[in-house]
Amino acid sequence: MPTPHIEAQKGEIADKILLPGDPLRAKFIAENFLEDAVQFNQVRGMLGFTGTYKGHRVSVMGTGMGIPSISIYANELITEYGVKRLIRVGTAGSVNEDVHIRDLVIGQAAATTSAIIRNDFPDFDFPQIADFDLLDKAYHIAKDLGITTHVGNILSSDLFYGGPDAVKVGKLGVKAVEMEAAGLYYLGAKYKVQTLGIMTISDHILTGESTTSEERQLTFTDMMKVGLETLISE
């Protein structure tokens, strides 16, 4: 049965899925990387597709921006459609001098300014951590492909404009700031499924460097390749 936000029938979504924030990036991935891709969702413009990649059945779907949005879709994908492996492929802003525009960042753990997780844990901070097996595979896949990749802590912020002091955050070793991974990692722990965030640096908060919206939608293919290869890895 369809959910309030996903119109797919049972069986139309694979148990492995890529989750870009931008639904047009989901369409780009389906059109350029998947064979026999079929669209399973367009509710609220959040496009989703299922196809095959190197003979493996996989899906890709947009999530929108922020932890509330990705949490809605990830919850429904896990609880209603049986998805077991979810990899976010999105953009992030660097807060580290050694992490440059178009580099990849794999988030080993995600701090957050969001209060959503505190609804379940009001008395202490619950750590949002990626699935180590997926992280390890993604890192080695990226290295084998010769892609500049950093592994470390990231920050999932509720604010795109404003938010935590970038210099202070960077001094703590945080690699980048984005808006979704902590929520996805928390749901991974809650439902005992595999989750990971692979981000491309689209902006450098310290230097002011940036990429265009068209670049963010259409050219960050390294992240897509690493995400797909990790998704189908044994």
Swiss-Prot record:
Provide a GO CC annotation, any one. Answer: cytosol
Q: Which PROSITE patterns match?
A: PNP_UDP_1
Indicate what this protein is called per its UniProt record. Answer: Purine nucleoside phosphorylase DeoD-type
Q: Which family does it belong to?
A: Belongs to the PNP/UDP phosphorylase family.
Q: Name one GO biological process term.
A: purine nucleoside catabolic process
Enzyme kind, highest EC tier: transferase
EC number(s) given by UniProt: 2.4.2.1
Subunit field text:
Homohexamer; trimer of homodimers.
User: Species name for this entry?
Assistant: Lactococcus lactis subsp. lactis (strain IL1403)
